[in-house]
Amino acid sequence: SGSHDEMVKSNGSFKLTVKIFWILAAIMLAIVLQGILRDGVSTWMPSYIAETFKLDNKISIFTGVFLPLFSIAVVQLTIFLYKKIPGELTLTGFMFGAGVISAFALYATDNTSAVISVLFAATLSGSMHGVNTMMTCMIPPYFGKYGNISFMAGLLNFCTYIGSAASGFGLALFSENFGWHNTLLLWSMIALCGCLLCLSITRIWNKFKIE
């Protein structure tokens, strides 16, 4: 009987370990994706505006200033919505969804209006800042019962830096080879992947929180 109980306990621990692994893997990948978009948009949007609409550098620089300011407002909105919408990954999925709509709208209106492009880019960038806030600040405490919260927070923040590094080199290379129009489509696809990834593990995440 004792041996049977130990086997059941061991099997339960293994299943929990596997569950934690998949949850963590999905969350880390989603954070990398938001890092690519968040820093990619803020870094390359001024260049896109300048090259696409042949505008003065001062205007494109203004774009680089406007995006972070708008993102601050979106982060505050995210914190407000967090109190209304149950489930961290549900809200994160919605924020990614807003990013999908913004990125695709940016793609669909490419080369039509600088103002419209900036507004959609600001919404996309802001959405990713909201995602980052949720995933790097609200999620780590739930892993406290399994280890060090600060380690988990550091690990998830590291994933953001991976995304940032990937956007710095990867998006530049992609835009040079395939053009801005396809780069905007790529942003849409990245946001869609993040949205589907978060929503796909929402149920298992909600169960994990109460175990």
Question: Where on the chain are the PLM-derived regions?
Answer:
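A membrane-interface helix-boundary motif in multi-pass transporters
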Residues: 171-191
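Juxtamembrane intracellular "pre-TM" segments in multi-pass secondary transporters
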Residues: 1-27
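Helix-to-loop junctions at the C-terminal end of transmembrane segments
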Residues: 74-87, 175
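Small/hydrophobic positions within alpha-helical transmembrane segments
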Residues: 33, 66, 70, 123, ...
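Extracytoplasmic gate region of multi-pass secondary transporters
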Residues: 17-79, 132, 136, 167
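C-terminal transmembrane helical hairpin of 12-TM major facilitator-type secondary transporters
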Residues: 88-138
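A late C-terminal transmembrane helix in Major Facilitator Superfamily
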Residues: 143-178
